[in-house]
């Protein structure tokens, strides 16, 4: 505070000198001005002050009509620990230091608002704000970075407005209470987020300042949804191709240059008019979207988080609004000023002017002129001293004395009074309160759900609208999780009715993207695949009513493209009967990549099967040193004529253009073998096109079944949802329980009731040992007999009741209704089950009773307490 006091005294002295100069200048100017001007000057009277006070009192401060359900009266404090209800001596000392600091600040800066130092907690106990922060590193890897932490806090908590928008809250609850009730104001949000960020290693601070109306009310209706912002496309500069030496000159341009210039002028005028209309429309929309003037602009209290650069490789300072989880630059106009900030170690007051919002603030907390700290010993280093200042403290004794003085004045911040912040896996997975949250953006609405809350796996939906009133839907995006069909995103365009499904790797058909307007077959659609998951290397398949195009990659035959043209069916059969009545193929076009193992003049680049015209066209790859490629065309004829005579290959059946003709390619045998090979390839291509049609039908049928079932996958580690794992765990628990009962049974002391009849500590005689052994065996034998009789009695009782029921059924069989017969059959089934179980238990008891008797007898002989028996049988 010494630096602050010196600074304030210097400013007051400068203000007094300036006021004296200003008064003297005003008197001189007043004497020089005319009388008429001097008459117009007025001073503020008591009546004018009362009128001003009345006008100011008429300003309505908008306070939320709904009282927040999260108040100190709704919190159960009976189960809170002692640290919440009392203060330690060190905390009491800290509160005294804070009060002294606040008094000095109020005395030296009377125009500033009171400091937000020690609000009450949920137990009505004052706690210093720095001790309310509890640095915590969450056990979830997703919460290790600042963006995921901020988004979690924004989703997990529900925003509650401040009771008074012009003042900080009177209560600041612990993060454990805020997590328990999932509600809080901006200070609760910031405290929670700052605790998580500090625990994750960030240099984070809670800020007490002023924000805009939208920021304080979490109003995002004038902000664009981040999910709708498209990434900027990088424009690649086209490299200028240098003209080759021997190139064909372009034809001479015979168009009129005057007409071209006039057309260019006309197009420029049209574009200028369109730009003007577009600019006017944008201005109109901006005027409609512009926020209304806020009477309390610059006065609304808000809290957010400041993250300084340095730790965790943060390149520059930035703000985080805990309400939305969005990050902002420190130059953002939404943040209008800062009063103070704090972390878990110290508290700082902003001594800089915020007339230009936070744009000119320098966040060097080690500068005591700009940031006044409350406690010494902060981790923020002070400003470096100049050489003149440094020359005066070269003596070692002075340095030691200075260190002792600082050590005496320093005060360590007490540990946080808040319990360890814990988020259960169930709460972390649920995220939003009650599993759902809705956020309204500008022309968009974002809905979020917890995983497994919706039966179809829907976790998020973004609805984009055309107008600001959000009435006309443009498109819908839906995100899914844990789908068995690996569906990740569904994009629906309401304008074109186009639907696009995106899949993660693992679909049975290796689907990646499916674009369609209708699930009916032979309609316009585009299907993309994960080519690494397919044997045939298919990347994409485009289908229309008359065409089908396929793109391949990584095939051993170097096929890259196949395009099939169809004609309408002769008979109008059902579309789903493509297997029995496929679409007639008119043309098949196939393209191939370059095969380096073959010479270019023998490597086919494109082949076209014209089925209706019975022709096959080939185009070969072009050599690097050539500008034209070889071509061939075969006239495909039947092997026999109408009379059954075999047709011989003739030269007119092959038309070829060869860049470098070779002798063997002119022979009819070569051409005949090539045509026979192409016939086989044509048959194979037709079969592959037919298989592609069947695969499309299979994919559509599978997608309809998946959409109807929308089965969700459950991890084997999710023991609460995984039924198989749950049944296995319950079975293991039953086995362990039965094993425990068997162990208890083996550890029963059969002699204890009989030894209790004798005086304690008395040594057994031989006669007493024999008598105890006989009594124990006879008692055990009687219990075995009683158990057998009990089972036999239950067996006979069940048998008699069943016989009576059967006799009753024989007597009343004619008058019985179907319901009575069903009840009778059900009873008989249950009775027979009980009789069968009792019979099995009785038979097992008869088998095990002698063995149990002999085992007990042997155990008694070996019991050290009946040592006399061992002497008898020794």
Swiss-Prot record:
UniProt GO BP: flagellated sperm motility; sperm axoneme assembly; spermatogenesis
Pfam families cross-referenced by the UniProt entry: CEPT76_peptidase (PF24656), DRC7_C (PF24671), MORN_DRC7 (PF24667)
Keyword Coiled coil: yes
Location(s), subcellular: Cell projection, Cilium, Flagellum; Cytoplasm, Cytoskeleton, Cilium axoneme; Cytoplasm, Cytoskeleton, Flagellum axoneme
Gene Ontology CC: one annotated term: motile cilium
Signal peptide, first to last residue: none
Region named Disordered: 1-22, 386-410
Comp. bias intervals (Acidic residues): 386-400
Listed InterPro entries: CEPT76/DRC7_peptidase-like_dom, DRC7/lobo, DRC7_C, MORN_DRC7, Papain-like_cys_pep_sf
Entry annotated with the keyword Isomerase: no
Coiled-coil stretches: 1-60, 257-297, 688-711, 781-807
Amino acid composition bias (Basic and acidic residues), ranges on this chain: 401-410
Entry superkingdom: Eukaryota
Keywords: Cell projection, Cilium, Coiled coil, Cytoplasm, Cytoskeleton, Differentiation, Flagellum, Spermatogenesis
Subunit structure comment from the entry: Component of the nexin-dynein regulatory complex (N-DRC). Interacts with TCTE1/DRC5. Interacts with DRC3 and GAS8/DRC4.
Its biological purpose: Component of the nexin-dynein regulatory complex (N-DRC) a key regulator of ciliary/flagellar motility which maintains the alignment and integrity of the distal axoneme and regulates microtubule sliding in motile axonemes. Involved in the regulation of flagellar motility. Essential for male fertility, sperm head morphogenesis and sperm flagellum formation.
Sequence similarity: Belongs to the DRC7 family.
Protein name according to UniProt: Dynein regulatory complex subunit 7
Naturally occurring in which organism (per UniProt): Macaca fascicularis (Crab-eating macaque)
